[in-house]
Design a protein with these regions (language model features):
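Conserved small/polar residues in nucleotide/adenosyl-binding loops
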Residues: 1-2
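Short, glycine/acidic-enriched loop or turn micro-motifs at the edges of active sites
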Residues: 13
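Active-site-adjacent substrate-binding region
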Residues: 16-19, 23-112
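His/Asp/Glu-rich mid-to-C-terminal helical/loop segments that flank catalytic regions of hydrolases
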Residues: 103-133
Length: 133
């Protein structure tokens, strides 16, 4: 498994205009802008974190561009605001190149979650392009 390249499929919190102070507007995931990549993930600052290398992100950008996939990059919300826990760090502990990828979700973990159908389709295209590369 060492040096394998992996996409950790997960969702990303979408910008919520009702709670704008939780996220930085310029680094948040938005509906209708495509598949989301989170280069850095973790909770409580640096606990259980993963940071994808610039080289790996560059390769993924080329794969997505070649596959005509719409994508966006995003960051987590404020430190200690909650959320951000993923399994990417576990895969990275085995020496894999890994980045979180998926769709933006509003109301994550609530009874009624919302996503963009267009983003879901772009994520599908992104995973197909990645597996074909």
């Amino acid at each position: 498994m060492y040096k394998r390249q992996v996409l950790s499929s997960d969702v990303s919190a979408a910008f919520d205009p009702n709670y704008p102070s939780v996220m930085d507007k310029k680094n948040a995931a938005y509906f209708g802008k495509g598949m989301v990549f989170n280069k850095y993930t973790g909770s409580r600052g640096k606990s259980g974190s993963n940071d994808a290398s610039a080289e790996y992100v560059g390769k993924l950008r080329a794969v997505m561009d070649d596959g005509n996939v719409f994508y966006q990059t995003a960051e987590l919300g404020k430190v200690d605001q909650g959320g951000g826990g993923t399994i990417a760090y576990i895969l990275a502990n085995y020496g894999m190149q890994v980045i979180d990828s998926g769709v933006a979700v509003l109301n994550m973990h609530a009874p009624w979650e919302i996503i963009s159908k267009a983003d879901l389709y772009e994520a599908y295209k992104g995973y197909v392009a990645f597996l074909a590369s």
